[in-house]
């Protein structure tokens, strides 16, 4: 249900009439639509992860020890920071969260490459790779989310300067 609501929010913000009714500029509405699109893509990956875990619960004990699962709390922390900054728009905090997400992405990429080195674990390799890719994509979409927030802040500052 939440997934459908997020998609509808994105569609609403892409409408110029909706922007007018919400008393936001067309540019702001497009940025909010971009935020909604990032959330929508993250939900796709979370849905994939959930489906995988439900269908392959025999892997759960081993998965808890893998870097992708261990990195999820750091991703959640960074995304939470970005979500809080929808309102506060603290550039330094947004950029710190984006840097943490980039570090997580890099570490997960290294992990994914290391999986291929041990061919004995083909089945575990496939599941670990799938989960790692989803967590890495969650980090990427969260970084995009942060970039949109920075763009929104910059537009707001530029509008203030212009209106003086």
Question: Language-model features: where?
Answer:
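Cytosolic, long alpha-helical scaffolding segments
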Residues: 1-164
């Amino acid at each position: 249900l939440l997934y459908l609501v997020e998609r509808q929010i994105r569609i609403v913000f892409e409408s110029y009439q909706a922007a007018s009714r919400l008393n936001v500029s067309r540019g702001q509405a497009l940025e909010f639509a971009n935020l909604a699109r990032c959330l929508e893509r993250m939900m796709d990956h979370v849905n994939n992860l959930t489906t995988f875990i439900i269908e392959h619960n025999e892997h759960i004990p081993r998965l808890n020890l893998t870097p992708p699962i261990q990195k999820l709390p750091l991703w959640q922390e960074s995304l939470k920071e970005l979500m809080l900054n929808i309102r506060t728009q603290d550039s330094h905090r947004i950029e710190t969260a984006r840097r943490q997400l980039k570090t997580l992405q890099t570490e997960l990429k290294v992990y994914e490459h290391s999986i291929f080195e041990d061919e004995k674990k083909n089945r575990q390799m496939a599941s670990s790779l799938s989960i790692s890719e989803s967590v890495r994509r969650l980090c990427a979409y969260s970084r995009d989310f942060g970039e949109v927030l920075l763009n929104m802040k910059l537009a707001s500052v530029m509008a203030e300067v212009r209106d003086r």
